[in-house]
Amino acid sequence: MGRFLLVTLSLLVGAFSLNEANSCCCPQDWLPKNGFCYKVFNDHKNWNDAEMFCRKFKPGCHLASIHSNADSADLAEYVSDYLKSDGNVWIGLNDPRKQRTWVWSDRSPTNYYSWNRGEPNNSKNNEYCVHLWALSGYLKWNDTPCKALYSFICQCRF
């Protein structure tokens, strides 16, 4: 019985330590997720300036990339909690060659999409950057002109 309690207690401590390891290194107000830290910035910037801001913030940082429904839901909840103004939020997906080939700014695989219905539509042949759509609760994406000014979310490793 004593050995069982010791093993159970050890497993609980280990599980707690692993959970803490995921969040130990993110600064306050950053979301820890899958080895990254995410932060929404309320400044309004165009897509390129937002990406450059993330890169200058810390080497290896980029606008956020999203790779699953779970990631999407967690980021949407985080943005809803921490964004101080209403409006759309830039993420790292863009079409730099303007050929309708979407890539993440961190060069991670483009293996998940959460487009809003009817998107991407490249309205006026001028929509090559992607934001989280506020009216969807930040769960859906919309392509939009890269010069639009929005808040943004950076993804970093600390």
Curated annotation (Swiss-Prot):
The entry's keywords: Calcium, Disulfide bond, Glycoprotein, Hemagglutinin, Lectin, Metal-binding, Secreted, Signal
Cellular compartment(s): Secreted
Signal peptide interval: 1-23
Cellular-component GO terms for this entry: extracellular region
Residue positions with a glycan: 121
GO molecular function, one term: metal ion binding
Keyword Disulfide bond: yes
Ranges spanned by the short sequence motif Mannose-binding, renumbered to the chain: 119-121
Binding positions for Ca(2+) per the UniProt entry: 127, 142-143
Tissue-specificity statement: Expressed by the venom gland.
Transmembrane residue ranges: none
Disulfide bond annotation, renumbered to this chain: 26-37, 54-154, 61-156, 129-146
UniProt keyword annotation of Calcium present: yes
C-type lectin domain segment(s): 33-155
InterPro entries noted in UniProt: C-type_lectin-like, C-type_lectin-like/link_sf, C-type_lectin/snaclec_domain, C-type_lectin_CS, CTDL_fold
Subunit structure: Dimer. Probably disulfide-linked homodimer.
Function: Mannose-binding lectin that binds to and agglutinates rabbit (but not human) erythrocytes in a calcium-dependent manner.
Similarity comment text for this entry: Belongs to the true venom lectin family.
Record protein name field: C-type lectin mannose-binding isoform
UniProt source species: Oxyuranus scutellatus
Upper taxonomic lineage: Eukaryota, Metazoa, Chordata, Craniata, Vertebrata
